[in-house]
Structure formats: structure tokens, C-alpha cells
Amino acid sequence: MNLQRYWGEIPISSSQTNRSSFDLLPREFRLVEVHDPPLHQPSANKPKPPTMLDIPSEPCSLTIHTIQLIQHNRRLRNLIATAQAQNQQQTEGVKTEESEPLPSCPGSPPLPDDLLPLDCKNPNAPFQIRHSDPESDFYRGKGEPVTELSWHSCRQLLYQAVATILAHAGFDCANESVLETLTDVAHEYCLKFTKLLRFAVDREARLGQTPFPDVMEQVFHEVGIGSVLSLQKFWQHRIKDYHSYMLQISKQLSEEYERIVNPEKATEDAKPVKIKEEPVSDITFPVSEELEADLASGDQSLPMGVLGAQSERFPSNLEVEASPQASSAEVNASPLWNLAHVKMEPQESEEGNVSGHGVLGSDVFEEPMSGMSEAGIPQSPDDSDSSYGSHSTDSLMGSSPVFNQRCKKRMRKI
């Protein structure tokens, strides 16, 4: 029996048994994977190096510790924001579910061994110039040959360096395509730098001179870096100073979080320190009997010890910083403290006054009176105008005409 055939129908072989249309369909339907168009990169045609390094790297410990501090500060800011939100809800009276207690302040990342103080360990200063001895084998070009890195190793190191730079700049995460693109940019920059350096060295060998002190200085100016000292400034400001700044920020954030978590402790620390105040008594200078006899006879002498030494003029319980004197050197330099015994003749108007004092002439002082400053005269503890020595009317300092009268009569020295 001949069956009617249609156009395009596949003939059935005699060896193939009759099967239904369901048997002809595939048993498992597979989804077609949709791929994004590949990003065009200069290094796309080269084999992609693995992420793991096949060579040991020596990262800068200062940079790595700065990155750890940045991550630590980010965690502290998140904890502070969470604690402040909980305190604000409690202040507003909003009923919230029982939340977990705030965790304790996380510890700061420890300093590396080469950044410890000098008394702990001798630090290895980064960028330390080694093998600078002209007599060394390294300086003469002798010793082990220089290790040559393959393209894959250089690519791995450059990839890791770019990731470190981004982390040091404050980025928390980055796409792999971004890292690959920035690695290509850094690769092209290094190629440009090395080509200019090769050209400058050949030009110096051909002409025998260079317009710059060194070919490296010339290439630095050509690529836009500037002087070689710019690298030192960058290291000082962007690496070392930035590390010190992050240490300070970490300390401030830790203290702030402790004040939020333990407000009672912060209140106790904020209490003012009470200082015990001791009463200050006036110091009187006793007048010797010989001085009283001289005053009674009409002759006055001003011994060196009348005003007293500095240790006698101030009580023992007062500190030197509380003294109104500027310093001991200024006290000793004043002509009043170095007077020798001066015998004075009484004035005609004061002959009858036994307690009156004579007047010192201008020839008594080797230096003019204008050279004395008010800082050289000790003031009273209660900021009064009277003398520091005594508040009585019989005080030599209070009524002596040395401080309130001009010279009227010429004296003679003993």
C-alpha cells in the first residue's frame, strides 16, 4: 500500500522502526547560555595570568598596616552608627524588639615588627639605600646575576600593586574588569617610562653629556613626575603622614565608641580633678637688733639679706611655677638683690623721725633704675598693690623711698 507523501518529508528507511513524533524529540531540553559581549582590552589576546602569585612578593608593611587601619576604622564607624541609632530609638520611646547588646570595641591591628619603636627592635627603614659602598661587589657589578621575571610574573605583580593602591586609597571592593583595565594603564605607563629611559641612556652614550644631572632626572621630568625628590615627598606625605593620620583617627573612633557603650565610665573620666588648696600666710621679715640701733641713731644700712633670698621669700609649700618671678636668673640679675651694705645719712626733714628711712643716691646702683621691670618686684599672693614681703606699715618694702622717691642726696659707700 503506497502512502501519499508530502514535499520535504524525510523518507523512512526500512531498517528504522516506526516511531512517533514524541520519540524524535530530545529527551532533555538544554538552555542556551547567554554571554555578555567581551570587553575589549589591550591584553585580551594574551593568556590571562592566574590570580595567585607564583613568586613571593615583599609588600610594604607600612602600606599594608594603613590598609588594615582603614578597614578597622570602617568597622568602627558602622558600630558607632548602630549604637547611635539604638540610643536615639530609646530616647524617642520607640518600642523595639530586644536587640543584642553592643559588642566590645575591636582591637586595633597590631603594628608590624619593622614599625615597632627602636627599643623593641631595630626597624628596617623602607627605601633604605643598600649596597651603596663603592667597594662592594654589588656596586662593581659582581655577584649573583639579576633575576629576570617573565611576562606572567610581571603581570601578577602589577595586578597586585594596582589592587593595593586602590585599597590604600580607600576603596573597599572593585570589579575584576576595573583591576584589569587599571593594570593595562599601569603597564602602558611603565613601557613609556622604560622606552624614554632607554632613549636617554643611548643619547648620553652618544653625546657624552645630558642636559640634566642624571638620565633618571631627565625621564622623570619628561613623564611629568618632576624631580626625583618628588618620590621622597610622596613617600613622606602620602604614605608616612597618612599612616600617622589613620592611627589618630582609629584612636578617636575607639574613644567615641567607648563613650557610647559605657557612658558611666565616660562620666567618671570627665569629672574635674579637685586640687587641695593650702592657705598661704604672709611672710614677715624680722629686723635685727643692730639694724634697729642704726635706725635709732639716724644712720640706715640696707643689708643684702633684708629682702631675703628667693628660697626665704617664698614658702616651702609653694611651687616655683606659682611664683610671680620670671626665673631665678632674672632675680639674681636685679640690682636690688645684689646690694652691698650701704650706709646712709638721714635727711634734714626726717632727722626727728626714728622710723624714717634714708634715700639712696644714684651712685649706689651700677645700673639705671629704668632697667628694672615690674616683673622683678614680687607681688602679693592676693594680687594687692602692697609688697609680697609684709603688709605692715613698718615694712621696708612698703615704705622705703627706694621704690617711690627719686634721688635727692648723694650717698657714700662703705
Swiss-Prot record:
GO terms for molecular function: protein heterodimerization activity; transcription coactivator activity. It is found in: Nucleus. Expressed at high levels in adenocarcinomas and gliomas and low in esophageal cancers and malignant hematological disease. Also expressed at high level in the thymus, low in peripheral blood mononuclear cells, and lowest in the stomach, small intestine, and skeletal muscle. Residues 386-395 have a biased composition (Low complexity). Component of the STAGA transcription coactivator-HAT complex, at least composed of SUPT3H, SUPT7L, GCN5L2, TAF5L, TAF6L, TADA3L, TAD1L, TAF10, TAF12 and TAF9. The modification Phosphoserine is found at residues 108, 323, 334. Keywords: Isopeptide bond, Nucleus, Phosphoprotein, Transcription, Transcription regulation, Ubl conjugation. One of its GO terms (biological process) is regulation of DNA repair. The keyword ATP-binding does not apply. Sumoylated. This is STAGA complex 65 subunit gamma. The keyword Cytoplasm does not apply. GO terms for cellular component: nucleoplasm; nucleus; SAGA complex. There is a cross-link at residue 271 (Glycyl lysine isopeptide (Lys-Gly) (interchain with G-Cter in SUMO2)). Gene3D superfamilies: Histone, subunit A (1.10.20.10). Pfam families: Bromo_TP. Residues 87-108, 346-414 are annotated as: Disordered. Disulfide bonds: none annotated.
